[in-house]
Amino acid sequence: LASHGYVMVSVDQNACNMLSGENDGRAVLLLENIGLLLGYNEEEGNPLEGMLDADNIAIAGHSRGGEMVATAYLFNGYDNYPENGNVDFDYHYNIRSIIAIAPTVDQYKPADHSVELEDVNYLLLHGACDRDVTNFQGMAQYEHITYTSEGDYLKTALYIAGANHGQF
């Protein structure tokens, strides 16, 4: 798929599971990994050289990762970390789509506000038999996505009968 611009990467963030208040760190970790991949895309002789479509990036996450991708999209548009203006961000990647699978919501709230997003495709998936995130929390994030431009965007939520938190 890489020859067509598709690369799937799983960023193992399980080490963050024993921490609290870590979702902002998860978002930075994802953005840093995107930067590595895009660097490989530009690196002469790298197997990924010229293979990635840097203009069409989608990010996906499950559970806390499902919340994290919304935070990553938010941070992607910032020049500084919202909790400390002395920490510079230099991301600004062309993230076009977010896929949130059974996400948590509001574990990270910049300046004590829910994460609000603009102008991004958003797919929310949640299982009706989820016993971990039991109340379709992702709908709260879904409601905090707005569109300001005339571009074509898709925002949809699917509540899937028979699916639980980890097996779809």
State the predicted function of each range.
Residues 80-103, 120, 156:
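A conserved short beta-strand
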Residues 17-20, 68, 106-111, 132-135, ...:
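Extracytoplasmic/secreted cell-surface and envelope-processing proteins
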Residues 66-78:
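Short glycine-enriched nucleophile-adjacent loop
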Residues 52-54, 95, 154:
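Core-facing hydrophobic residues within beta-strands of well-ordered domains
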